[in-house]
Amino acid sequence: MVPGLALVLFGCIALLWIPVPSHTILLKAFNDFCHFPLFGGVAIILLYLARQLGEPRGWSVGSQYGMAFVGAVVLGAVSEGLQSLSSSRFAEWSDLLLDVVGAVCVLGLYATYDRNITGRLAVWRQAPWKHLVHAGVVLLTLTALSTVLIWTYAYWDRAARFPSLCQFSSSWEMLFVQGKESELQIVPPPLGWGNPRIDTVGQVVFYPKRYPGIRIEEPYADWRGFSRFRVDVYSELPTVRSLVIRIDDAHHNNEYEDRFNQAITILPGLNHIVMPLDDIRQAPVGRELDLSAIRTVMFFAASPPEEFSLYVDNIRLE
């Protein structure tokens, strides 16, 4: 029995090395959460092994639980350390934390039903201490699952706002927006914007770096059925500025010719930028951009000589 369980244990650890697709932020969050139940199972297997090896040697029940917990933590740390040596996997402290919390929760829950726990420790199998442990396990489980729940709602909110891609009006939509070599803030529109229905816009400060700008990661992916992409950009600068709009699909090979790239001129004042989706679809060389699988939208400046600021809003399809 013990050799068989040891084999199962190493099989559980080996699951961490199986390539799992993480093509979306939500799927990556779920894959990360899976460390929680996986190492809960590892801890239970280690507890059983400690019991089989320890009872004949007089190990206390507390020692058995302690060895199971320490063993799970060590295995989690070793697996993360080995992943740091791999070019295809990345070690993350958050994964190790989920390993630890998973082991704590499953061992704690099991202890409230474990008849081997006797004496003073037996109070943990009785009310109210048993219920207190159960409440703690539920709280820790929900905490571990919180990232998945947050991204699940963010995806629902993204779908509800479509065909708007970004209005800079919600903390949920801003989860998908990242600044690179720039600073992004949600601010009231400048006085010259001239649309009283707009409460907030995005202010982007472009630093004098190589490609400062903003990136919308995973906008609503299916753009079929629409004809135009638009964005409003307001400039308080006295001179014109140049930006580049870049759009990738899920099949992008990271080559310049395999995506949509369009330089646009930003004049002083309000600029309504409108682009036909047919132009976007036909942009890659040798293939068509997949309008059912849009992956990224970017706005950036190419090596600006100095810092400057623009206001962006109303990124949408029509």
Locate the predicted segments by residue.
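Beta-rich carbohydrate-recognition modules and glycan-binding surfaces
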Residues: 138-318
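Intrinsically disordered, low-complexity, mixed-charge
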Residues: 1-200
